[in-house]
Amino acid sequence: MKRFNFLILLSTVLISLFPNRALADIGGLTKCSESPAFEKRLKASVKKLEQRMGKYEAGSPPALALQQQIERTQARFDKYSRSELLCGTDGLPHLIADGRWSHAAEFILPGFGFIYISGWIGWVGRKYLRAVSTTKNPTESEIIINVPLALKIMTTGYIWPISAWQEFISNDLVALDEEVTVSPR
């Protein structure tokens, strides 16, 4: 019995140390450069713009604007086809956020950008509310925004991670338990 337990333990350790990699495609997605639906979408977009351009005289401002839009559309599709983005059956690029490092650029930079900007907005809002709470009529200042004060606070908000860390260290970021009101139930 001890030998059997040892073999089970050994096989479990070996399986957990050397797992087989499962290399499956990601939900039927293909590289955009190899996707027929992606090419079809490009042709349909360009054709639609060319039909609109046919309604105007060559060289007229609307025709020139549509020609520029066609060039931008082709450049966008070309950029997607040169990248490692994967397209679905609809021909649209899909972002993969499953932890694979090969798709990190698709999600990490936009994700950090979103977190930074939303943190900036939240930090500036918090700082504004704390600043107007010391005025003689704070409720009115919350409804009717003091634009010069708000702009001043917004321009300093880009360093919100440093400010948040400093307030966290000085115990000014989190309210004390005595300051938090609890409604009786």
UniProtKB/Swiss-Prot annotation:
It is a multi-pass membrane protein. One of its GO terms (cellular component) is photosystem I reaction center. Residues 1-24 form the signal peptide. It comes from the Eukaryota. Keywords: Chloroplast, Membrane, Photosynthesis, Photosystem I, Plastid, Signal, Thylakoid, Transmembrane, Transmembrane helix. Its main location: plastid. It is found in: Plastid, Chloroplast thylakoid membrane. The keyword Glycoprotein does not apply. The chain crosses the membrane at residues 104-124, 143-163. Probably participates in efficiency of electron transfer from plastocyanin to P700 (or cytochrome c553 in algae and cyanobacteria). This plastocyanin-docking protein contributes to the specific association of plastocyanin to PSI. This is Photosystem I reaction center subunit III.
